[in-house]
Amino acid sequence: MPAVQLYIVGRNPTQQVRQLRRQPNVIVTGAVPDVRPYLVQAWVAVAPLRIARGVQNKILEAMAMELPVVGTPAALQGTWATTTDGVRIAESPHVFARDLVTLLEDHALRRQCGLQARRYVQEHHQWDEHNARLEALLRELVVAQATA
């Protein structure tokens, strides 16, 4: 896909990633103060992580901005999102490439997945919801401690 530009945004890119700058249409930014200007220009977010721990905020940020995400199982495991939530879980490089090309070529599907992604974040990853759960848990601990 010659018209596609790939932006690799994030701190501490490896030497192997930095060398990708030599490829036409590949931009490696390194650390940026705010990822949103890059996301607002994107059609799809990709997360080809082989190792990931916990929730990947970068994925939730992309989903919140109505971007479909193609990611590895490792990258998406902490989000608990499924294919009905605007993500494509790619088990192999072949599937990763296929899903990415499909989304790049199909505007309607891309839009639908982006809307699903945003809805998922709104329903499952809002601070108010998590703060309420944390507050309830802390109250339970205080009561349990007081009665112990």
Q: What positions do the PLM features span?
A:
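Conserved acidic donor-binding segment of nucleotide-sugar-dependent glycosyltransferases
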Residues: 87-94, 102-107
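A charged, aromatic-enriched C-terminal amphipathic alpha-helix characteristic of glycosyltransferases
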Residues: 108-138
